[in-house]
Swiss-Prot record:
Subcellular location: Membrane
Membrane-spanning segments: 23-43
Keywords: Heme, Iron, Membrane, Metal-binding, Monooxygenase, Oxidoreductase, Transmembrane, Transmembrane helix
GO-annotated molecular function: heme binding; iron ion binding; oxidoreductase activity, acting on paired donors, with incorporation or reduction of molecular oxygen, NAD(P)H as one donor, and incorporation of one atom of oxygen
EC nos: 1.14.-.-
Native species: Zea mays (Maize)
SUPFAM superfamilies tied to this protein: Cytochrome P450 (SSF48264)
Entries under Pfam families matching the protein: p450 (PF00067)
UniProt cross-references to PROSITE patterns, sorted A to Z: CYTOCHROME_P450
Recorded family membership: Belongs to the cytochrome P450 family.
Chief location bin: membrane
Protein name: Cytochrome P450 71C3
Lineage per the UniProt record: Eukaryota, Viridiplantae, Streptophyta, Embryophyta, Tracheophyta
Topology versus the membrane: Single-pass membrane protein
Amino acid sequence: MALQAAYEYLQQAVGHGAWSSTQTLTLLLIAVPTVLLLLASLAKSTSSSGRGKPPLPPSPPGTLPIVGHLHHIGPQTHISLQELVAKYGHNGFLFLRAGAVPTLIVSSPSAAEAVMRTHDHICASRPWSMASHILRYNTCDVAFSPLGEYWQQTRKLMNTHLLSNKKVYSFRHGREEEVCLVVDNLREAAAKSPSTAVDMSEVLAAYTNDVVSRSVLGSTHRKKGRNTLFREMTMTNVDLLVGFNLEYYIPRWPLTDLLFRLVCWKVTRHLKRWDALLEEVIHEHVEMRKLSGDKEKESDDFIDIFLSRYEEYGFTMDNVKSLLMNVFEAAIETSYLVLESAMAELMNHRRVMKKLQAEVRAYGAEKKLDMIREDDLSSLPYLKASMKEALRLHPPGPLLLPHYSTADCQIDGYHIPANPRVLVNGWAIGRDPAVWEKPEEFMPERFMRDGWDKSNSYSGQDFRYLPFGSGRRICPGANFGLATMEIMLANLMYHFDWEVPNEKEDGCWKVSMDEKFGLMLRRNELLYLVPRASS
């Protein structure tokens, strides 16, 4: 079973689905002896150098050649890791080998705090990945670049000039206009055929994509279908980045070098498409800036801001392209998937939806509003709580992007060697029964008490709740994503009543919440709902 799992991962990585059993067996026969020698050498080294040190965190039994502990992990990786920590771990820590890669699993608030606060200076780097390195112009981005001076400069640029509260707020009119387009289209669909279901997965995905494209490209975001093209290319990025990293598992022998070349070719080909498109839109912005005198304006989009600032930070145009790619990846699919899950949860919890609709509609009626605008959101506490609850149950990524320990350290009485991957299971922390009352239930009320309503829940300082991470690597675009999601959810509740297609009169019909593991959790089924304009 373990070898079959490795075989399926290899198929996904190189994009071929028809290897012969002979080819697969040949590959494994080449790899097995080498990996056994490497593991034996590593075990000997660890044994001789580890005398007198505290023990490693506990591990599951039965390490196998090549796959390590991967045979313990099913297709729902985040759930498998949660179960393994519960069975074999201690205080939320578990140490395992993913292939030949030592990996520290972090699955409790106290463990997360130890890694991302106490030892953040050691554990906040990123592991090297061949796909990410190529796709990011030799790791020129902010999300995957290792800790260091370059990362500090990119982070400073993003936080100061692109994603500050002031700059995010300056884009509010664009978000409001995109919401109006969605509301108008839904009204039209409901009027034409009151009982016809709408693919809300597509509606929400298109909306978040258009908001991001508009912020990055400005008024040209729909030119030549660019908004759609950027969305397609971003989805491919996610698939490439979540694919099996061959360099972690197979030694670099001449006979296996072909596999690495195939992966490099696939990623490089995709990068060329990105490069051509980014060159085109950047060139257009350069020409427009010449006409306007290169002066910075509040209405500047992300490309304008990069062009006015990149030389100040000593960046090249490749740095700019890599950072633009980060913006698309971080904002498009994450926001859409959380919105989709929020709507699905509300359909399964009608009491919550009615309470949310009552709050939004009472406020709108009092203020005589044609729509809920961003300036109104702070007056809607149950809306805020509902979004927090959706993010608790359905964080943008079930596992935070992998961290990397750059030096030996001691955590919770355990020796953590240098160079392991560190995976924080944010999904498991958000459902920890030791922390959350009825953790599997959708209960926004929990965020209206116990100080949650007054705290900055998204700051990463409360390690019970980490939808955007914590420490040095906390997501810099949290405010942008929240603004995008909250205004859409508010207006969907304000303007429409919602039904499930062919809904039973007794209300027992449930929307499936089954999800597929990946860099982000994607629902197994599209969300079809019937909108009815509220009276």
